[in-house]
């Protein structure tokens, strides 16, 4: 394993274009899983993804040079899956299953390229949209966010001295290792890297993954980043995302179809995949609404990934639902991944251990925690909340309600309609930091 001196590489940066995205596998595993199903069942749907900066106080268009951003986006569009990558996808075992991806899908990937983008500046922010077939626009989400976050990081460290950069990265490494030492104390912990989309940079994410792999040993069960999984002989981790119910809801012709849209697309998911991939994401239109109306077969799924409610509150609610359905929570799995850090991982672990199977996805606070590390005390490396969500489906506006109204996306009039259909019970507003 070659260890890169990140500080030296940053300081010596002099080339015209240092590509942020170098592989189409530099994405989250669930994008490929969803893509295979999308291609089978939704190949004709036109879906727009839009970047949203929830941290409005950070004016990205005044920090990131537009020419540099366009150059990175343009470069990403030139990348194709390599023969080596396709052979690995076709032949590897994922979640205990061989041939997770069909031969026909692998052949289709060989010709895949990212579609065009639409970019403009508006009031200090970038408006970045990806229009086209869902089979193609979906693959922009992760690279677009990674590009924006890394360009912001590069702008923040530009002009810093060689030794200042040494100190910056030394402090960040020590900070991470302190977290690893705390996590080592949690017996039978199961933790994965979920930090691609909001990482400080690719090299930093790679360092973090390799460090946690060494530091936690078998407690580190894998990474959502497909490229890092391939390069580091790790499990690729991930199931499905909010875009599935958001698109299904956007296609609904009336309120009754809207109410059942999340379950209809999950039923398609279980027909495509099974076993350990049966993890439901319940909060797209509110967890309480999801559990209230869920068909009986949802209780037979492997587990849930609570994503926007406070973790202990969400976990207790799901456990109570399982018990009401006559299922034993000890046989089920909860995957906690919303802004988790060492403190919330410890608290959630101690609260639920022995009552339910647990797994944790560690994202931004693993791969982009430079808070307090800058020698000059600046805050411009602190992480921001940047997302890329479905904004329209076949010309109809898309909506995400979330358990936290601060995370809701969509037109106000459409949000009101969705609240009328799904209800507003159990949604609690809290600040969104990452």
Swiss-Prot record:
Q: Name one GO biological process term.
A: NAD biosynthetic process via the salvage pathway
Quick one: a GO cellular component term?
cytosol
Q: Which residues carry this modification: Phosphohistidine?
A: 242
Pathway listed for it? Cofactor biosynthesis; NAD(+) biosynthesis; nicotinate D-ribonucleotide from nicotinate: step 1/1
Lineage: superkingdom:
Bacteria
**Molecular function terms from GO:** nicotinate phosphoribosyltransferase activity
Ordered alphabetically, the record's keywords are: Ligase, Phosphoprotein, Pyridine nucleotide biosynthesis
EC no. given is 6.3.4.21
Q: How is it modified after translation?
A: Transiently phosphorylated on a His residue during the reaction cycle. Phosphorylation strongly increases the affinity for substrates and increases the rate of nicotinate D-ribonucleotide production. Dephosphorylation regenerates the low-affinity form of the enzyme, leading to product release.
Catalysed reaction per UniProt?
nicotinate + 5-phospho-alpha-D-ribose 1-diphosphate + ATP + H2O = nicotinate beta-D-ribonucleotide + ADP + phosphate + diphosphate
Q: Where are the transmembrane segments?
A: none
Q: Which family does it belong to?
A: Belongs to the NAPRTase family.
Protein purpose = Catalyzes the synthesis of beta-nicotinate D-ribonucleotide from nicotinate and 5-phospho-D-ribose 1-phosphate at the expense of ATP.
- The protein, known as: Nicotinate phosphoribosyltransferase
Q: What species does this protein belong to?
A: Bradyrhizobium diazoefficiens (strain JCM 10833 / BCRC 13528 / IAM 13628 / NBRC 14792 / USDA 110)
Could you tell me the gene encoding this protein? pncB
């Amino acid at each position: 394993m070659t260890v890169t001196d990140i500080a030296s590489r940053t300081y010596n940066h002099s080339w015209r274009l240092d590509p942020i995205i170098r592989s189409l596998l530099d994405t989250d595993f669930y994008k490929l899983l969803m893509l295979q199903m999308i291609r089978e069942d939704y190949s004709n749907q036109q879906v727009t993804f839009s970047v949203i900066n929830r941290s409005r106080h950070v004016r990205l268009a005044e920090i990131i040079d537009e020419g540099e951003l366009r150059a990175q986006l343009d470069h990403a569009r030139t990348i194709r899956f390599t023969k080596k990558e396709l052979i690995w996808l076709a032949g590897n075992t994922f979640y205990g299953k061989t041939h997770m991806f069909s031969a026909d899908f692998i052949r289709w990937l060989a010709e895949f390229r990212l579609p065009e983008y639409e970019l403009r500046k508006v009031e200090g922010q970038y408006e970045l949209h990806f229009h086209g077939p869902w089979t193609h626009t979906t693959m922009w989400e992760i690279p677009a966010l990674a590009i924006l976050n890394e360009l912001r990081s590069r702008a923040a460290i530009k002009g810093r001295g060689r030794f200042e950069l040494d100190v910056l990265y030394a402090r960040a490494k020590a900070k991470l290792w302190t977290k690893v030492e705390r996590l080592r104390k949690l017996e039978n912990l199961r933790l994965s890297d979920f930090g691609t989309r909001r990482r400080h940079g690719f090299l930093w994410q790679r360092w973090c993954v390799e460090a946690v792999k060494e530091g936690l040993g078998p407690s580190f069960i894998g990474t959502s980043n497909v490229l890092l999984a391939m390069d580091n002989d790790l499990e690729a981790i991930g199931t499905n995302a909010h875009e599935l119910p958001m698109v299904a809801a956007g296609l609904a012709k009336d309120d009754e179809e809207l109410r059942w849209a999340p379950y209809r697309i999950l039923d398609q998911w279980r027909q495509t995949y099974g076993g350990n991939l049966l993890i439901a994401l319940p909060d797209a239109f509110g967890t309480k609404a999801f559990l209230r109306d869920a068909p009986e077969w949802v209780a037979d799924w492997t587990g849930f990934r609570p994503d926007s409610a406070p973790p202990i509150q969400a976990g207790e609610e799901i456990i109570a639902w399982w018990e009401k359905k006559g299922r034993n929570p000890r046989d089920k799995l909860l995957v906690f991944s919303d802004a988790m850090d060492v403190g919330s991982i410890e608290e959630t672990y101690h609260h639920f251990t022995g009552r339910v199977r647990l797994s944790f996805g560690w994202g931004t606070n693993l791969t982009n925690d430079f808070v307090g590390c800058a020698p000059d005390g600046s805050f411009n490396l602190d992480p921001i909340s940047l997302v890329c969500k479905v904004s329209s489906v076949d010309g109809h506006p898309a909506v995400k309600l979330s358990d936290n109204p601060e995370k809701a996306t969509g037109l106000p009039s459409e949000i009101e309609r969705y609240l009328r259909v799904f209800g507003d019970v159990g949604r609690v507003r809290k600040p969104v930091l990452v």
